[in-house]
Swiss-Prot record:
A motif ('Ionic lock' involved in activated form stabilization) lies at residues 125-127. The chain crosses the membrane at residues 27-51, 64-90, 103-124, 145-165, 193-217, 255-276, 287-308. The lineage of its organism: Eukaryota, Metazoa, Spiralia, Lophotrochozoa, Mollusca. The modification N6-(retinylidene)lysine is found at K298. One of its GO terms (cellular component) is membrane. The gene is RHO. This is Rhodopsin.
Amino acid sequence: NETWWYNPYMDIHSHWKQFDQVPAAVYYSLGIFIAICGIIGCAGNGIVIYLFTKTKSLQTPANMFIINLAFSDFTFSLVNGFPMMTISCFLKHWVFGQAACKVYGLIGGIFGLTSIMTMTMISIDRYNVIRRPMSASKKMSHRKAFIMIVFVWIWSTIWAIGPIFGWGAYQLEGVLCNCSFDYITRDASTRSNIVCMYIFAFMFPIVVIFFCYFNIVMSVSNHEKEMAAMAKRLNAKELRKAQAGASAEMKLAKISIVIVTQSLLSWSPYAIVALLAQFGPIEWVTPYAAQLPVMFAKASAIHNPMIYSVSHPKFREAIASNFPWILTCCQYDEKEIEDDKDAEAEIPAAEQSGGESVDAAQMKEMMAMMQKMQAQQQQQPAYPPQGYPPQGYPPPPPQGYPPQGYPPQGYPPQGYPPPPQGPPPQGPPPQAAPPQGVD
């Protein structure tokens, strides 16, 4: 069908008109995939929001970023994926009109960029906690976390709202069943919009995230070496606390790194296709090539609840209390869950009273233990004691000793003592006669 792209309610870019229509099976498969991602994304992130808002132990400043991320992913799944795109895929064309296309693209841009920027704030928070644990716990608060979240939304909206006012545009892409920012048109407005979004809304967060997590990994490695050196000097209780703190610290770093990696893999294809369309061979941007980033982006909303349900002990504990059937369905390793709970039980839950994150409490515990060991070493008396040996000891030899010319020249004489003559004596060695008067 040469006019498969025709839509009386939409302006279709001429780039997409040169390609043949994709098979019907592709539309239906894409619609089913988007529906599954939308349902799982809404359900999973809805559970995360419910548990984090209901469970008091999870209501920490650091976890406010997780709630914000879950809210962003929930709304992204609800509006930008299912059901609008699913319906269009089954009907094989966009059916909601030009105005809805702009709103759809705007919502996708805002919530997509919000997810990336929230990941950036999570990495900054983890960096401050692990690299500067004593100061991070004092500075981070619910108010500061709220201000950072407001900044995330303002920053994301600034870059997403440009096409609404003529800086770029929102239009149909790929198989023409969803709308996104225009990365096909090669004019000054579109190109400047793409370049600025790539630098400030994509590369800038990536650089910050990589910087933070590189330093986190280096810090974790250094802490492990320090804990290994301390292990020989700690008693059993302190050693267990140290091991629990190091284990929890490593797990928290791994959780955050996995989440960030998943998000970057979800949004990097969009950046690659946009740059290819603007500066590379545009004929490579086929409907299939343009639709693959859409699938990665829509699936990003389901990663975070899955990662946290598997890796976050306190979150799993909240699931077990409210939704035990999820643990049964997913077949969690109960022994691993208990081990994680035991490990975290060794760390005082300071955030319940002071508002600081679990990370800060763990790091403060480790720092306090290290300071205690240093204080104990300083209290032990130095050996040898200061001032020993006394000054002037041992005394110097008397003046003129030994006398000059001592020993005399030629002493001992050559051949002294004389070597024994003849073969060694035969038989047993002679026995000395007993002293007189002894029987």
